[in-house]
Regions:
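Substrate-binding/catalytic lobe of Class I Rossmann-like enzymes that use SAM or dcSAM, i.e.
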Residues: 228, 234-336, 346-348
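Conserved SAM-binding loop of SAM-dependent methyltransferases across substrates and taxa
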Residues: 132-144
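A short acidic, Gly/Pro-enriched loop at the edge of an enzyme's catalytic core
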Residues: 182-193
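A short glycine-rich, Lys/Arg-flanked "PGG" loop and its adjoining helix->strand segment in the class I
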Residues: 206-221
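Conserved SAM-binding motif I beta-strand of class I
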Residues: 147-152
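Conserved class I S-adenosyl-L-methionine
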Residues: 121-131
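Conserved SAM-binding strand-loop segment of SAM-dependent methyltransferases
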Residues: 167-182
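Conserved Class I S-adenosyl-L-methionine-dependent methyltransferase catalytic core
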Residues: 32-116
């Protein structure tokens, strides 16, 4: 069976299979995932949920952190500048209307983040997993008297953010390159800790939240944005040829449930919780794919430089990755896989 799947994937990666057929296959695999994880079987679902929860509690903070860098950031920043929106926001954006464009959707999302995290000028704000600085730079612009400390595991991203900060005259940004497993920061130093789509690369939230609790001031808050499933949580593992996403784009990652954090409140207490429909990510990923296709002429030489003889296959893999994100989060009109926002306060001693 694995041989048949392998040959089918090679055909799909050749670019000969129409996008419509690829999207249909992705929807079928999404349904298969729901069945495997016990979405429609209460007994199986509860057991699977607890098995994963116990695994998380006995894991290190994050695994395969170097692999995540390789899989997403070996392409030069120029690729993401051509594919993402103006802010280089590599995460779900917010589309209040059908006519909303990607650049505008980025701005809507960032403003929502600020409101929900209760950000104010003059605060010391830590961003964990800052990407190319979409939120870090936005906060630095919006709150000139705030001090922004951003953490990324990518030296390339650090260079990009500092270059942009210098260009725009932003003097209130510090960027740290570090693996979250070994990250150590000053205690009681931050008014806010914010994170956008980084906690999906985390396994042991108890250990991470303990660290964050120590970094926050007494009245400090943690706010985070994650993608998640409404009921299920599961790790991305490479067990068979079916596990294409785990192999090429999300090794060591986790699909949290909207309830996963509820089990990790020893150090931080959940104060508020919001959800977005998965259709916002569907629209985001489709916009990225549209930009990639539109800029194919300028981007394909980048792929040839990075991937050499495998350039054509990797071009299609990135296209499939964006289609997979769009179809997964658009599944059942965005009511299965969704976006979660969480606000935590320090637990009373």
């Amino acid at each position: 069976m694995d041989f048949i799947i392998n040959q089918s994937l090679k055909l799909v990666e050749s670019g000969l299979v129409p996008d419509q057929a690829i999207r249909a296959a992705i929807r079928a695999l999404s349904k298969k995932r729901l069945i495997q994880e016990g979405r429609y079987d209460p007994e199986q679902g509860a057991q699977r949920y607890m098995d994963v929860l116990n695994m998380l509690k006995h894991s290190q903070i994050a695994i395969e952190t170097d692999k995540a860098n390789e899989q997403h950031y070996e392409l030069p920043t120029a690729f993401f500048e051509a594919v993402l929106g103006k802010r280089l926001k590599y995460s779900a954006c917010f589309f209040p209307h059908d006519r909303t464009g990607l650049d505008e959707a980025e701005e809507f999302a960032l403003q929502i983040y600020s409101d929900r995290a209760q950000l104010n000028d003059g605060q010391h704000i830590l961003e964990l997993g800052c990407g190319w600085g979409s939120f870090t730079l936005w906060m630095a612009e919006r709150y000139p008297n705030a001090k922004i400390t951003a953490v990324s595991n990518s030296a390339t991203q650090r260079q990009h953010i500092l270059s942009k900060a210098e260009k725009y005259g932003l003097m209130n940004i510090d960027v740290i390159t570090c693996d979250v497993n070994v990250l150590e920061l000053q205690q009681n130093a931050f008014d806010r800790v914010v994170s956008v789509e980084m906690f999906e690369h985390v396994r042991n939230y108890q250990k991470l939240f303990e660290k964050i609790q120590s970094w926050l001031k007494a009245d400090g808050l943690l706010w985070c944005h994650i993608f998640c499933h409404r009921f299920l949580h599961y790790p991305f593992e490479i067990k068979s040829e079916y596990d294409w996403m785990s192999r090429y784009f999300f090794t060591g990652g986790l699909m949290p449930a909207s309830s996963t954090f509820l089990h990790f409140q020893q150090h931080l207490e959940l104060s508020q919780h919001w959800q977005w429909s998965g259709t916002h990510y569907e629209k985001t990923a489709n916009a990225w794919l549209e930009n990639m296709d539109h800029n194919a002429e300028q981007l394909k030489p980048l792929f040839e430089k990075v991937y050499a003889q495998d350039a054509a296959a990797w071009w299609q893999r990135w296209r499939i990755f964006f289609m997979a994100c769009a179809e997964l989060f658009g599944f059942e009109q965005g009511q299965e896989w969704i976006i979660g926002h969480f606000l935590f306060k320090k637990k009373a001693v």
